[in-house]
Each structure stands twice: as C-alpha cells, then as structure tokens.
Amino acid sequence: MKRYILFLIASFVAISVSAQRITHDFRDVSMSKALKMIEANTSKYKINFIYNELEDFTVTTSIDKKTVPDAIRDVIGFYPIRMTVDGDNIFVECIQKENTKLIGEVIDKRGQPIVYANISLLSAKDSTFINGGVSNLAGKFVIPCSAKHALVKVSCIGYKTILRAFDAGDIGKIIMTEDMQVIKGVIVKGHRPIFKHEENKIIFDINQMQKIENLTSKDVLKFAPGVIINSNGEIKMAGKKATVFVNGRQLSDEEQSAFMTNLKASEISKIELSQNHG
C-alpha cells in the first residue's frame, strides 16, 4: 500500500545562508536574551527587535552549527514571531500585538515537562476559539491574549485533556495525568516518542498510534502540535494559514479538502510540521 508524508508549513520568508555558524544550548532564557547572544556571535548581522515585546517568550533548545537565520528560526520555534532579513539587518517581531499574554508550564505528575502540548484559549462566554499555542521543550508556553479571562484547553496525546478558566497573566504549572485511551479509541504505543524535533520541524510519527483504521488524515491532524482546523476545514498553524504538501507536492485548496476527507490515517507514514520550507 502506498503511504504518504504530509508536510505542513506556516508562511515564512526565504533567507539566504551565511558562512557563520552558531552553537549554543539555550535553557529557559528569554527570547530577547537569546537573540542578543546570537548577535554577539556574528559580525555579519544586526538583529533588531523590541526588547519588551519579546521578553516574556522563553527559549529552550539546542543549536549546533547553524547559520544565524537558522539559529533564530530554532529559538522562535512555534511562537507567533516573524523574522525578516534586509541586507545585513534581521528584524524579529511578535505578529500578535496584544497587551496581555497567557503564560504557563505544562508538566506531568512527576514534574517532567510535557512537550508539544496544544493550548487553546476559548471565550469564557461562548467557548469560541481566541488563540492557541504549543508548549516548548521545557513545557512552557506564551500566548498573546486580548481577553482578561478565558477558558484554557490543554491537550496532548496520551494525557487527559484539561479545561479550566484562568485570568490572563502567568497561570503557573498545569499538571496533566496520563490516559492511554484517546479520541475515538486511538491508542499510543509508547515505545518511541510520537513527536520528535528535527532541524526546523516537528516530526509526528503516525506509526506510534494504533487503532487508526477508521480515522481520516483530518482526524489525525487534530492531534498535531499547534494545528487548528476551523469549522470550514481551513488548517492553521502557529496562527497562520498552513500550506499542505503531500510527498513534496503542494496541494491546492480543493485538493487539500479532498485529501483531508478521503485520505485514511493508515495511509500516512508521518506528518512534518515546519515554520519554513526549503
């Protein structure tokens, strides 16, 4: 049986590479500090950003011999932050200009970080979607939010979904409990990580899921970190419309709708999620 690879990307500006390489382990440092550290290790680029705009976003990632643009891509991750390049200047800005943010940390009962959990902010009045984000390698998340109060939905494969009301600001730690039974009876095998970070993308290993025979690709995508599927079927990632590739070929909107409905989950070998392509 032919198997497919789905590749989703959020819009991003193509960047030329530099001979300079960055190697560093970032452990729970602010985005502002991470960018300053990268800038200190390059003589080619000046990195421009508004300090207070990015200070609340925290970075936990390891960078090994990356170009300056690629290093910045890694520290940005799936935050709603955009990078553009103009000659020797790199501009980094948050694309969601809200005065308040929802800040927190997702952990298990042993205190270990839960990586790539989906966090959705819903209206406290009617549960409509406001904004969303993904926990990073330290289990932490920062989501710009215009609402002072919101319902916070936290979900991750293998854990019980949490739905609680919070005020905007730092809500502290959210503890999730394990639950091998997930939507529609799908079971996670648990032998290998179902999500894996490679270069500038997240690999969603469909082979680590059982009982998916009756699911479509659309059903499985609902498990993917940072992916939101609107009621009209539009796929968004990191707050932006996602471009969908199947085995390297970009799908039109019409093809995308057909694939999401007709392509069975069992026909997919893996899903790749990225904020850039090429």
Model-assigned labels for residue ranges:
Residues 35, 41-42, 79, 85-99, ...:
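Short, acidic, small-residue-rich periplasmic hinge/interaction motif at the N-terminus
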Residues 125-140:
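Short, acidic Ser/Thr/Gly-rich low-complexity loop/linker segments typical of extracellular
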Residues 142-144, 249-278:
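Short acidic/polar hinge/loop motifs at secondary-structure boundaries
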Residues 139-145, 173-175:
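Exposed aromatic-hydrophobic patches
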Residues 15-97, 127-131, 192-198, 232-243:
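N-terminal export/assembly leaders
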Residues 112-114, 142-150, 166, 212, ...:
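Short Pro-Gly-centered beta-turn/loop motif in secreted/extracellular proteins
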Residues 1-26, 34-38, 119, 151, ...:
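Bacterial Sec-dependent N-terminal signal peptides
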Residues 218-252, 270:
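Extracytoplasmic beta-strand/coil segments of soluble accessory domains associated
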